[in-house]
Each structure stands twice: as structure tokens, then as C-alpha cells.
Design a protein with these regions (language model features):
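Non-catalytic, solvent-exposed segments at the cell envelope interface
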Residues: 2-365
Length: 365
């Protein structure tokens, strides 16, 4: 059999292909079947692939946009609902401290300090801040820090230019003077305050469903003996608002250090309770709680603070301490009153390190 060759040498477009026979080409063996012609599979056109990829990317982008819009709608509706929830409260403005310049106060853009005050007394002229706890929201170290100030601390009341117990500042000039006095004596910038009457405090705890705290046998016996309430001892004892208030106000059992410690335990329990509460339920509770509170925060500021770190703050660790510590003061009688005379330099350094630089180990404080 002769091979056939087709010549492609055309002299013009009208020429036909010239076919040649090759007499020297070897013949295939007779016992081998003729081989099928080999064809390379056709490759799909590249433009179609690109078109499909673009189509998939477009669908993914549309899904992303739809999800983003849904999130915006949810956040916006939550923002409006939260704004409405915190609108019915007692607003009281907080002016700049006129007794000390802001440059003399320690502050940080990553820390928000809110002074919580438990006010004791039915008459405004006789009210004293029986409990003062500075809540420091530390975004840099992802912590919520609670600092109790002992009410018997002997401090300068700047508006009176005289020394007195710390808890007297509120009776002299309300929340404004209480904040000014703390800043003046301790050098820490306080951004906001929230005050609640102790009678209201028990209602707040009830609206949150009570708290679980450790109650020692000594504390339980004292409450059972001196009040009309019955409380058991244990590592996790459930207290309603009335019992929690009695627990916070134990005074004659031990020291003021322990009294403030019990108050911080209840505040910590409230925060932990909030962590386990669904957001929608928490907002509904806030609607009931805020009318019981007096604060300088506007509804917009409260809502902004909640959305600035509200979700992440539920994961923050909680640390607590008090000032002064035992080695930062001398306790004794002063002008017929039991007072704590402070080493202010030591206290200021301690507060700075605890609140701002996170250098203090408070496990044993």
C-alpha cells in the first residue's frame, strides 16, 4: 500500500492540492487491525469560562449585599428600640470640674469611667452616697474594672475648702460635687455618673431576676438575727432584691472593707447575669430600669456606648479592688468620727496602674 501525501504548495487560490503516492512507504502488518484516527478533544472556549466565573462572583456579591442590608436593618431597628428603652430616665448634667484642670487628671481614650452611687436617705438635703463604685470599661485590655471608694475616707471637699468624709460630698452638692471631689483628691478623670436610691436598687435586682452570690455562715447568721429576712449560707445563694440590699448594707458585722467587697460582689453578679441574658430581653429590662436611675448620659450616649462595645463587653473579664488598701491609710478617730486618713500619692499611683496600665494583680485585694 502506498502512502499518500498532499502538497500545500499552491501557486494561486484556484490551484487544487497535488496528491503524490509514496512507493517506498512500508505496509502495515496484516494481523494488526487498522488504527482509529486520533483526535485531540476540543477545548471549551475560554470566554465561556470567564463568563461563568463572572456570573458566580456576581451572585456571591449580591448575596453579600443582601446580608449586609439585613444586618443594617437589624442593627438600625435595635438601635431605635434601645434608644427608646433608655429615654425615660432622670437626666442631670455633669459640668467640667472647676476645682482642678483636666490636664491634672489621668485619662485615656480607651477607658471610660462611670461612677456608680448608691444614695441613702429620703430627703435630698440629707442624702449621702453610701456606696461609690467606679466602673472602668477598659477597651485596651478588654476588662471591666470595679473600684470601691471607702465612704470614711478623709478627703478635701473642694467647694467647702475643708476636710470631711467622702460620702458627705453628695449631701453638700449632689452628684456634681461627688464627682468633683473624687477627681480632685484621686486624680482620675470621671466621664459619667449614675446614681440610684438604695430602695430603687432592690427593684433593679428584682427586674433582673435576682442575683447569685456567696454568703458566708457568719453573714447569713447576722442577716437572720438582725433583719426580718432569712438567708442561707453557701457558695451560690440566690438573693432577691430585698435580700441583696440587706446583704450589701451589712455594716456592724466586720469592716467597711468587707462591706464594699460585698457590694462589688453583687455588682459583679449583676454583670454576669446580664452576660447570660438575651439581648432582646436585656433591652426590655433596661426599659424598666432606667426610670429608676439618675445620670448625665443622654439616650444617644447610652446607646452609642452600648453599640461601641456592648457585645464585646459581655466577654470582658471583671476585676475589682478598693481604695484605700490597708497599707495606704491610717484608720482612727478624727473630730469624733471614725475616718481613714489616706496616703494620696500611693493611692493615686495604685489607681493609675489598676485602671489604665493593668499592672495590678488584684487576686488578693
Amino acid at each position: 500500500m502506498k502512502d499518500i501525501y498532499i502538497s500545500k504548495d499552491k501557486k494561486s487560490s484556484d490551484d487544487f492540492d497535488v496528491v503524490y503516492l509514496d512507493d517506498t512507504a512500508p505496509l502495515p502488518p496484516l494481523d494488526e487491525p487498522p488504527q482509529e484516527p486520533q483526535f485531540e478533544p476540543e477545548q471549551p472556549e475560554r470566554p465561556q469560562k470567564v463568563k461563568k466565573a463572572k456570573k458566580h462572583r456576581k451572585h456571591r456579591f449580591l448575596r453579600f449585599v443582601a446580608a449586609f442590608i439585613a444586618v443594617i436593618i437589624v442593627l438600625t431597628s435595635s438601635f431605635i428600640y434601645l434608644f427608646a428603652a433608655v429615654s425615660g430616665y432622670n437626666k442631670e448634667n455633669l459640668e467640667a470640674n472647676q476645682y482642678i484642670s483636666s490636664s491634672e487628671l489621668t485619662s485615656s481614650s480607651m477607658v471610660t469611667n462611670i461612677l456608680l452611687m448608691g444614695v441613702d436617705g429620703s430627703s435630698k438635703t440629707s442624702q449621702r452616697s453610701d456606696s461609690m463604685i467606679l466602673v472602668s470599661i477598659d477597651m485596651a485590655h478588654r476588662k471591666i474594672k470595679l473600684t470601691s471608694f471607702l465612704r470614711d475616707s478623709w478627703v478635701t471637699i473642694p467647694s467647702k475648702d475643708k476636710m470631711a468624709k467622702l460620702n458627705a460630698a453628695y449631701s453638700y452638692g449632689g452628684a456634681q460635687l461627688a464627682v468633683d471631689t473624687l477627681e480632685y483628691n484621686f486624680g482620675v478623670d470621671i466621664d459619667h455618673f449614675a446614681a440610684v436610691d438604695f430602695d430603687m436598687f432592690s427593684q433593679i435586682i428584682d427586674k433582673l431576676g435576682g442575683v447569685d452570690v456567696e454568703v458566708t455562715e457568719k453573714e447569713a447568721k447576722f442577716i437572720n438575727r438582725t433583719t426580718r429576712y432569712t438567708v442561707e449560707s453557701g457558695e451560690s445563694v440566690h438573693l432577691d432584691g430585698a435580700k441583696a440590699l440587706v446583704y450589701c448594707r451589712i455594716r456592724k458585722l466586720d469592716t467597711d472593707y468587707m462591706r464594699t467587697y460585698r457590694q462589688r460582689k453583687v455588682i459583679t453578679a449583676l454583670i454576669n447575669k446580664a452576660k447570660r441574658t438575651p439581648l432582646t430581653k436585656l433591652i426590655a429590662i433596661m426599659r424598666d430600669i432606667f426610670p429608676l436611675i439618675t445620670t448625665d448620659l443622654s439616650p444617644l450616649e447610652i446607646t452609642g456606648l452600648a453599640y461601641k462595645g456592648g457585645m464585646s463587653m459581655l466577654l470582658f473579664d471583671i476585676e475589682q479592688t478598693r481604695v484605700p488598701l490597708e497599707d495606704q491609710c491610717d484608720a482612727g478617730m478624727h473630730n469624733g468620727q471614725w475616718t481613714e486618713e489616706l496616703d494620696f500619692d500611693a493611692v493615686r499611683r495604685y489607681l493609675h496602674d489598676f485602671i489604665y496600665t493593668d499592672k495590678i494583680d488584684v487576686s488578693d485585694k
